[in-house]
Amino acid sequence: MGALGLQGRGGRPQGTGCLLLAVAGATSLVTLLLAVPITVLAVLALVPQEQGGLVMESAGLGAQAQQGLSKSNGLPSRLHSQIPSSSKNPFLRPGALSSHGKHPWVATLPPIVASTPVPGFQQLQEEKPETDLSSRLPAAHLIGAWMKGQGLSWEAKKEEAFLRSGTQFSGAEGLALPQDGLYYLYCNVGYRGRAPPSGAGPQDRSVTLRSSLYRAGGAYGRGAPELLLEGAETVTPVLDRAGRPQYRPLWYTSVGFGGLVQLRRGERVYVNISHPDMVDYRRGKTFFGAVMVGLVPSASLGKCLHSANV
């Protein structure tokens, strides 16, 4: 008798079913083993590509922003290649997203100030320095000084005194101005004195102090001075009930004035005072001077505009 094969239910041999089951199991195992590395490789291959896409997108946005900035500033096209993009910026992380999670950060350069004006903006014009004429205009400032045997004299080189732009001073002839023009003249004389002696009459109790500015020379001649400006001050004592003066041991006052005068070249200005023995020579008390403030027509020279007494 021959050998009989194994049969299962339905009359089918059991060896064929086991073989098919083994083949299916092996196929599933191989498929599972191959799927894992393929998946890993696919992930590794896709992730850099996406990040690179983000970087390229940020670079594209940065290039567009830089291109628009260069157009608004008037930069030539040859400078576009010199502007680094965000992909070359070491401070920008590739693929870094903004706080909103929508757009990546774009690194841009600070705006470049162009020499050409931008439409819609006002351009400040350079202010040219104004020419200072004060240093070239004739001017003088003299201070009072006491000189032994002469009394009041004028100092032109000490303390605040000065002569500028051709002005000259002589104690005998006065202040000479170098050119025709409109000048501002000023004078201030300080006075001080003591109470009058007791028993003096009423007419001797008041003292009127005068200071005057004269001009001479030029069209007026050496011996024909003309009064330009003058100021006066009267010192009157306060009387007590008995009618006696109540002077303090010393009294102080000053006479000051100034005004505009049209002067010609060669004319000289000098000061005349009524009580030279009462002049106060302390610093800042007695002085006079002149400063040119403008030009005037030659036909109107010789006129004087007086100002009120100070």
Curated annotation (Swiss-Prot):
Residues 49-310 are extracellular. PROSITE patterns: THD_2. The keyword Transmembrane applies. It is a single-pass type II membrane protein. Pfam families: TNF. Residues 138-293 form the THD domain. SMART domains: TNF. CDD domains: TNF. Glycans are attached at N272. The keyword Transmembrane helix applies. Residues 67-86 are annotated as: Disordered. The chain crosses the membrane at residues 28-48. One of its GO terms (molecular function) is tumor necrosis factor receptor binding. It is found in: Membrane. Residues 1-27 are cytoplasmic. Belongs to the tumor necrosis factor family. Cytokine that binds to LTBR/TNFRSF3. May play a specific role in immune response regulation. Provides the membrane anchor for the attachment of the heterotrimeric complex to the cell surface. This is Lymphotoxin-beta.
